[in-house]
Amino acid sequence: MRVIHDYGLVRVVSLGDPFNLTYDIEVQCQRDGEWHLYQGFDSLSDDYAYTNAREAAGHAIRERAAEIAGASRC
């Protein structure tokens, strides 16, 4: 596994061999100290997998920020 982009609580990772994995590019979010799949991409069938992963990471960052902001208001 190789971390492509690390945004703190959100990261984009390359898991390696696209021939043996459903998703070889993953956007992951950290919750309770563990990384969870947010959205996956297959670089063999998606020519824009890395671009789409960066866009999905932006959505994940906004969602996590809203969750954290909502939790701190209560």
Put a short name on every predicted segment.
Residues 32-74:
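Mixed-charge, Lys/Arg-enriched low-complexity segments
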Residues 1-30:
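Short N-terminal "domain-start" leader segments
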